[in-house]
């Protein structure tokens, strides 16, 4: 990659050092330019005047005005050209009338000047430059790579570049092509930086803490997280079957939703509970560590027997809560009547409005757990479900050439596992392409009453 600024080539030099380790001293370049000698009080004329616009040096990270090493108290205004004949006439006229003349000056660029991408393009063998890794996912302080095989011999140098060229990065890891089959998280190797994998990641106005080596997290799904959260209404209850560390559950809780959040991975469950507390939603987001099928089957009766607090409006800040607490203490101390909190006046929430099933590899296989979900329920509980919950099920399909075929494939598999036909209240959302022959979708459907009130599986 070549970066050019009129008359000057600022691209890094051809790398001639070792390829087993990075020789930073090989990255040095001297750019001879002209400089205008001026008194400090006249610098503004040269920087702000129209005459100099096409002549001034405009290289990123290089100052246009420097001290004159030969004339104490004077300044040098650097130009972008090395030859006087290249200076525009209007600029040359200003230089002749308002300066102490021209002088030569060397602009020195070194390893610190160029970006990681520019250094890498110079460092790699020519046949590997096209398609070289140029991006990475950030999770907290961790830069997460997925290097192709041909770049593995240079993985530690790539890691070093990313670490040194990005201030937010403290740890660089590369995904190894194996995945924990039970809990979905990827194995990874440290390329550079600290072996510190407990991150604090911000998404959807929430703060998430987790060990990146022990739980599943995919930053590419933040748009999908936000999309579904917008569907939920604050007064509703959401049952998150495969909640992970809470990318759906915690923002839904902050919105005001009651949430039953479940994950089979003990580490995910641990951080899910921590994140609920850290985001001050642990009163309405309840964490569980169960098999997804078991969680679905228990969810309706669990909420009926242990309702979540009623929605009482937007959550107060810590400062507002503290002011209210002191006000109530003052009323009590003065012997006045202390008002009953709104949450205690209202009945708790006892009906699930949404089930979220974000386990695209196998979520469809859990849908049979909805069979007979409400069979045998007492009349009062059955009345709560005069309108069935919505189910949002993420899945993969190999039907990538046609949206119609993709939706048909997903619908067929869902209906087979549910044991009943879907209603007209069914929609499909394309999430992303994960491979050349594999797309991710979310199917949202109203749970058919004949499934929920039918025989248990």
From Swiss-Prot:
GO cellular component terms attached to this protein's record: mitochondrial matrix; nucleus
| An individual GO BP term | mitochondrial tRNA methylation
**What is the recorded function of this protein according to its Swiss-Prot or TrEMBL entry?**
Specifically methylates the N1 position of guanosine-37 in various cytoplasmic and mitochondrial tRNAs. Methylation is not dependent on the nature of the nucleoside 5' of the target nucleoside. This is the first step in the biosynthesis of wybutosine (yW), a modified base adjacent to the anticodon of tRNAs and required for accurate decoding.
Q: Does the keyword S-adenosyl-L-methionine apply?
A: yes
The family note in this entry says:
Belongs to the class I-like SAM-binding methyltransferase superfamily. TRM5/TYW2 family.
Q: Where in the cell is it found?
A: Mitochondrion matrix; Nucleus; Cytoplasm
Q: How does it assemble?
A: Monomer.
Q: Where does S-adenosyl-L-methionine bind?
A: 225, 263-264, 291-292, 358
Q: Which organism is it from?
A: Coprinopsis cinerea (strain Okayama-7 / 130 / ATCC MYA-4618 / FGSC 9003) (Inky cap fungus)
Q: Does the keyword DNA repair apply?
A: no
Q: Which UniProt keywords apply?
A: Cytoplasm, Methyltransferase, Mitochondrion, Nucleus, S-adenosyl-L-methionine, Transferase, tRNA processing
Catalytic activity as recorded in UniProt: guanosine(37) in tRNA + S-adenosyl-L-methionine = N(1)-methylguanosine(37) in tRNA + S-adenosyl-L-homocysteine + H(+)
Named from the GO MF annotations, one term is:
tRNA (guanine(37)-N1)-methyltransferase activity
Broadest EC class? transferase
Q: What is its EC number?
A: 2.1.1.228
Know the name of this protein?
tRNA (guanine(37)-N(1))-methyltransferase
Record-linked InterPro entries: MeTrfase_TRM5/TYW2, SAM-dependent_MTases_sf, TRM5-TYW2-like_MTfase, TRM5/TYW2-like_N, tRNA_Gua_MeTrfase_euk
């Amino acid at each position: 990659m070549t970066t050019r600024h009129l008359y000057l080539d600022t691209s890094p030099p051809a790398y001639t050092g070792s390829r087993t380790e990075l020789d930073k001293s090989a990255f040095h370049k001297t750019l001879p330019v002209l400089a205008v000698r001026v008194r400090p009080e006249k610098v503004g004329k040269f920087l702000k005047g129209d005459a100099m616009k096409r002549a001034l040096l405009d290289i990123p990270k290089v100052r246009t005005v420097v001290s004159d090493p030969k004339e104490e108290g004077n300044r040098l205004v650097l130009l972008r050209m090395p030859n006087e004949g290249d200076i525009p006439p209007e600029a040359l006229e200003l230089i002749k009338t308002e300066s102490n003349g021209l002088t030569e000056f060397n602009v020195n660029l070194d390893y610190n000047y160029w970006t990681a991408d520019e250094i890498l393009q110079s460092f790699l063998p020519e046949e590997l430059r096209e398609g070289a890794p140029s991006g990475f996912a950030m999770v907290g302080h961790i830069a997460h790579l997925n290097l192709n095989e041909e770049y593995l011999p240079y993985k530690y140098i790539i890691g070093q570049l990313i670490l040194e060229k990005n201030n937010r990065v403290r740890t660089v890891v590369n995904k190894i092509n194996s995945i924990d089959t039970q809990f979905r998280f990827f194995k990874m190797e440290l390329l550079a930086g600290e072996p510190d994998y407990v991150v604090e990641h911000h998404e959807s106005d929430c703060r998430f803490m987790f060990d990146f080596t022990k739980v599943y997290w995919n930053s590419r799904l933040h748009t999908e997280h936000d999309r579904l959260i917008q569907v939920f209404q604050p007064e509703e209850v959401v049952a998150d079957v495969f909640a992970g560390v809470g990318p759906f559950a915690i923002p839904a809780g902050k919105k005001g939703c009651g949430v039953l959040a479940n994950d089979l991975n003990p580490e995910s469950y641990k951080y899910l509970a921590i994140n609920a507390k850290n985001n001050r939603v642990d009163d309405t987001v309840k964490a569980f560590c169960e098999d997804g099928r078991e969680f679905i089957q228990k969810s309706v009766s669990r909420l009926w027997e242990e309702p979540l607090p009623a929605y009482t409006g937007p959550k107060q800040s810590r400062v507002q809560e503290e002011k209210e607490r002191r006000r109530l203490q003052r009323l009590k101390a003065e012997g006045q009547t202390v008002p009953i909190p709104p949450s205690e006046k209202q009945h708790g929430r006892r009906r699930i409005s949404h089930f979220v099933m974000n386990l695209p590899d196998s979520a469809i296989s859990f849908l049979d757990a909805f069979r007979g979900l409400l069979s045998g329920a007492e009349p009062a509980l059955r009345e709560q479900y005069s309108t069935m919950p919505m189910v949002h099920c993420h899945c993969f399909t190999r039907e990538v050439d046609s949206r119609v075929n993709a939706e048909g494939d997903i619908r067929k598999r869902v209906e087979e596992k549910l044991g009943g036909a879907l209603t007209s209240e069914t929609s499909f959302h394309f999430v992303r392409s994960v491979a050349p022959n594999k797309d991710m979708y979310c199917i949202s459907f109203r749970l058919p009453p004949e499934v929920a009130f039918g025989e248990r599986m």
